[in-house]
């Protein structure tokens, strides 16, 4: 387990939730004696939608909406058995998508 690396990718629409979750992960990993790199903020994806408001063919009346997907990356370089166990038990916010890969 000493030579492995755990890479955690987080995605969320709310930047406060993702920052809170990354701080919980980093705090848990450091408390168990692992080395942490990050959190690294990845580029935010902005998805824009334009909707016609008028029921007729009036192209001047439009509303625009956007969804921002915030992303963070955390690398745990030298995880211990305690680190893996603590991360498995960690309860994160429901609005955060977590992807974990071992490398």
Curated annotation (Swiss-Prot):
Pfam assignment, any one: Ribosomal_S10
Residue intervals passing through the bilayer: none
Assigned keywords, A-Z: Ribonucleoprotein, Ribosomal protein
MF annotations from Gene Ontology: structural constituent of ribosome; tRNA binding
GO annotation, biological process: translation
Gene Ontology CC annotations of this record: ribonucleoprotein complex; ribosome
Function recorded in the entry: Involved in the binding of tRNA to the ribosomes.
Similarity remark: Belongs to the universal ribosomal protein uS10 family.
Subunit organization: Part of the 30S ribosomal subunit.
Designated name of the protein: Small ribosomal subunit protein uS10
Organism: Wigglesworthia glossinidia brevipalpis
């Amino acid at each position: 387990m000493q030579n492995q690396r755990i890479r955690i990718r987080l995605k969320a629409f709310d930047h406060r939730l993702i920052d809170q979750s990354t701080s919980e992960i980093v705090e848990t990993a450091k408390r168990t004696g692992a080395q942490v790199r990050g959190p690294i903020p990845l580029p935010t994806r902005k998805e824009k939608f334009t909707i016609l408001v008028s029921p007729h063919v009036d192209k001047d009346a439009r509303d625009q909406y956007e969804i921002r997907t915030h992303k963070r990356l955390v690398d745990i370089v030298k995880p211990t058995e305690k680190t893996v166990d603590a991360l498995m038990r960690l309860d994160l916010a429901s609005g955060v998508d977590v992807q974990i890969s071992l490398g």
